């Protein structure tokens, strides 16, 4: 019988439920249990694929091509499991499914209501994940904050599941914030009110995770336990830590892992967290600082690139390097030039993105890395920018571009994929998900991966224009990764350069703590070597031609 853990949040949004869920999954997996995870998002969008990163942050792409909440990235990285489109459900999806069934006549003329039709659809999605994953434990995070009107159908559905699957097979965890006032005193009243709001919809929390930026003493735990009607053992302090990867160990040391196993009636097995403890020990070690520039469109909101950031850290931790990310707005590069803004960095990364705003700054950054021998990693749009920059150099003209930004460009080295030309809808229509890529022996990409074929996750409509393949290759561009039919260019690189590699896919989605992605590992290693060499010379060297 599958066990279910439902995680809600109170007091404020962004209280850390996603990291908490991911950490709980890690504790259960360390005890030998199989785990799957679901995020229930209360917004009416079908998925975040068409949402602004400023509204939602990163869109995380699953192997089966779903555009999902960034929390799924945390789940995958912490638990080291590949999730699917079943793991992210939105209110938009639920209502769309129910209305479609009503239009087909599935409800036989009945009046469609939130209860039971919407709640039944929510429960069906949870059950579908449990059946398909065959997991011992399914953890479900309910987005938003208890008290929000948008979350009510989800809360009602998980309340009903207590009866559907049996009380012994369900655990409710509530994550709250303990704010402090100017005297330094932590206040429990918001948590008490949040627990009461949860009770008002028929749910009594079994565990309270208390977020705070300072230690929580036993008196406060006992007070919360009294008002929430839970064991003191079930009031778990979660202080702010230096690294999110410390959270599973904090929860384990507070006894949460054993408590969950006990309450769910699972076999009591000791956790194997040695690899995780070794990871955290490496994070805490003193390391050489390595400045890396991330040149993007949404750099004001770091969550827009959260998987890229984590992938950089994974590779840096392995090599005992403290990566110092310099957040560079691409529009600033356009105004001020790359030499001024990229001075003193030893690696340049241009991540994925869409739209014309800031594109010339990204192209200039890619060209600056090429000219000055600074290690470069381009991801998706970052690969297209590198292609445009190189082609402008080879063809001797600035009139080289992607048709996404200039449909009338004389040299469209990046063009819309043929199977995208008749598509008018935006949502869920790109080239999405896992696709194979054949690597060319003797290239940096092949050496980094150490194999002939890989599978990577994609999210794009535009691709390298094969009309320019021959002329660019003859000028020194190395095409090191291709689709199996050899029609799609997946990786490009430059041979006489410390590291200039760019991929059409998103390698960041498959990086894991303790198992960094090969392209990020190679990039960080090359940047570290450039740092050592740079101590004997002044960086940067010269302005790029594209600035």
Curated annotation (Swiss-Prot):
CTP binds at residues 13, 148-150, 187-192, 223. This is CTP synthase. One of its GO terms (biological process) is 'de novo' CTP biosynthetic process. InterPro entries: Class_I_gatase-like (IPR029062), CTP_synthase (IPR004468), CTP_synthase_N (IPR017456), GATASE (IPR017926), GATase1_CTP_Synthase (IPR033828), P-loop_NTPase (IPR027417). It catalyses: UTP + L-glutamine + ATP + H2O = CTP + L-glutamate + ADP + phosphate + 2 H(+); L-glutamine + H2O = L-glutamate + NH4(+); UTP + NH4(+) + ATP = CTP + ADP + phosphate + 2 H(+). Its EC number is 6.3.4.2. Mg(2+) binds at residues 71, 141. It holds the Pfam family GATase. Residues 1-266 are annotated as: Amidoligase domain. Gene3D superfamilies: 3.40.50.880, P-loop containing nucleotide triphosphate hydrolases.
């Amino acid at each position: 019988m599958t066990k279910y853990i439902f995680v809600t949040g109170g007091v404020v949004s962004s209280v850390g439920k996603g990291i908490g869920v991911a950490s709980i999954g890690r504790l259960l997996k360390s005890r030998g249990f199989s785990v799957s995870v679901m995020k229930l998002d209360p917004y009416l969008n079908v998925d975040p694929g068409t949402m602004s990163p400023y509204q939602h942050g990163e869109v995380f792409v699953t192997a089966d091509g779903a555009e999902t909440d960034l929390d799924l990235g945390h789940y995958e990285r912490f638990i080291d499991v590949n999730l699917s489109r079943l793991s992210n459900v939105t209110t938009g999806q639920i209502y769309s499914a129910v209305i479609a069934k009503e239009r087909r006549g599935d409800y036989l003329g009945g009046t469609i209501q939130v209860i039971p039709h919407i709640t039944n659809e929510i429960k069906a999605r949870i059950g579908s994940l449990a059946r398909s994953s065959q997991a011992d434990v399914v953890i479900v995070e309910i987005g938003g904050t208890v008290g929000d009107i948008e979350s009510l159908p989800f809360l009602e559905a998980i309340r009903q599941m207590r009866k559907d699957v049996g009380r012994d097979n369900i655990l409710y965890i509530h994550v709250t914030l303990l704010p402090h006032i100017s005297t330094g005193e932590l206040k429990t009243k918001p948590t008490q009110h949040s627990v009461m709001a949860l009770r008002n919809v028929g749910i009594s929390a079994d565990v309270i995770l208390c977020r705070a930026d300072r230690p929580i003493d036993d008196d406060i735990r006992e007070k919360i336990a009294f008002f929430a009607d839970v064991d003191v053992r079930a009031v778990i302090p979660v202080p702010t830590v230096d690294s999110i990867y410390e959270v599973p160990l904090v929860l384990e040391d507070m006894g949460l892992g054993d408590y969950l196993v006990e309450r769910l009636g699972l076999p009591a097995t000791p956790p194997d967290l040695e690899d995780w403890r070794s990871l955290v020990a490496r994070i805490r070690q003193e390391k050489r600082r390595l400045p890396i520039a991330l040149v993007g469109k949404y750099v004001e909101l770091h969550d827009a690139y959260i998987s890229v950031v984590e992938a950089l850290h994974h590779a840096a931790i392995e090599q005992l390097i403290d990566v110092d990310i310099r957040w560079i707005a691409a529009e600033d590069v356009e105004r001020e030039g790359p030499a001024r803004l990229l001075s003193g960095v030893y690696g340049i990364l241009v991540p994925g993105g869409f739209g014309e705003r800031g594109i010339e700054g990204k192209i200039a950054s890619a060209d600056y890395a090429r000219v000055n021998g600074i290690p470069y990693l381009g991801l998706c749009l970052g690969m297209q920018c590198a292609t445009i920059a190189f082609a402008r150099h080879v063809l001797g003209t600035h009139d080289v571009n992607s048709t996404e930004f200039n449909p009338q460009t004389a040299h469209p080295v990046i063009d819309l994929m043929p199977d995208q030309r008749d598509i008018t809808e935006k949502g869920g229509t790109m080239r999405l998900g896992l696709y194979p890529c054949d690597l060319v022996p003797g290239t940096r990409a092949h050496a980094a991966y150490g194999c002939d074929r890989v599978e990577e996750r994609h999210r794009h409509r535009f691709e390298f224009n094969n009309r320019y393949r021959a002329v660019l290759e003859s000028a020194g561009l190395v095409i090191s990764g291709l689709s199996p039919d050899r029609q799609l260019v997946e990786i490009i690189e430059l041979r006489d350069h410390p590291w200039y590699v760019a991929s059409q896919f998103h390698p960041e989605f498959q990086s894991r703590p303790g198992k960094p992605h090969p392209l990020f590992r190679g990039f960080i290693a090359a940047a570290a070597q450039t740092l050592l060499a740079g101590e004997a010379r002044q960086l940067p060297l010269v302005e790029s031609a594209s600035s």
